[in-house]
Regions:
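Internal, well-ordered alpha-helical scaffold/interface segments
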Residues: 31, 49, 53, 57, ...
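ATP/adenylate-binding site constellation spanning eukaryotic-like Ser/Thr protein kinases
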Residues: 22, 30, 71, 75, ...
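Short alpha-helical segments that sit at the start of domains
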Residues: 61-85
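Long, low-complexity, charged/polar intrinsically disordered regions in eukaryotic proteins
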Residues: 43-67
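Basic, amphipathic alpha-helical hairpins
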Residues: 36-44, 62, 85-91
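Phosphate-/nucleic-acid-contacting segments
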Residues: 77, 83-143
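Cyclic-nucleotide recognition modules
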Residues: 1-52
Length: 143
C-alpha cells in the first residue's frame, strides 16, 4: 500500500512510483473514504479503520527511523536501533530483520565502517553479534 497519505493532502503535487514488476494500482477517491456509503455497510468502516491503522503504523516507523538518523555517530545510530529492537522484542536477544548491508543503508552509514563499529562494540562487551543474531549486554547511558 502506498500513497495513502496523499489522499488527505490538500495539494496537487504529483507522485512518482517505479514498480519492480508488473502490478495493478487501485485509486480510491478521497470522498469515498471520508463519506459513508448510503447503506452504512460494515465494509466501509473496516476499510477506513484499516487505512487509519496503516497510516499510524507507517508514521510510527518513520518516527523511529528519524530518531535513529538524527544520531550523529555510527555507534549512536546502532545503539538507538538496537535499543528499539530490544524494546519491541521485549528481550535483549533479537534477530536483525535484514542483512548488514541493508542495515547500513537503513541507518545511512558506510557498511565497512559499520562493521568495524560492531566489532568495537563487541570487543568492548556491549554486544554479542553473530551474523544477524544480536545480544545486548550493556549500552551506554543516554546523554
Amino acid at each position: 500500500v502506498f500513497g495513502e497519505n496523499l489522499g488527505f493532502a490538500w495539494t496537487d503535487d504529483g507522485f512518482f512510483l517505479l514498480a519492480e514488476e508488473d502490478c495493478s494500482v487501485l485509486f480510491i477517491d478521497y470522498e469515498h473514504i471520508v463519506k459513508r456509503c448510503p447503506k452504512a455497510c460494515a465494509h466501509h468502516s473496516t476499510v477506513v479503520s484499516n487505512l487509519v491503522k496503516l497510516m499510524s503504523e507507517k508514521t510510527q516507523a518513520l518516527s523511529e527511523h528519524l530518531e535513529i538518523l538524527s544520531r550523529r555517530t555510527t555507534r549512536e545510530k546502532l545503539t538507538a536501533y538496537f535499543s528499539m529492537l530490544a524494546a519491541k522484542n521485549k528481550s535483549l536477544y533479537f534477530t536483525l530483520p535484514f542483512s548488514q548491508t541493508s542495515l547500513a543503508d537503513y541507518i545511512c552509514v558506510d557498511r565497512s565502517a559499520m562493521v568495524r563499529e560492531l566489532k568495537r562494540m563487541s570487543d568492548e562487551g556491549m554486544i554479542e553479534i553473530e551474523r544477524r543474531n544480536v545480544k545486548l549486554i550493556r549500552l551506554p547511558a543516554e546523554k
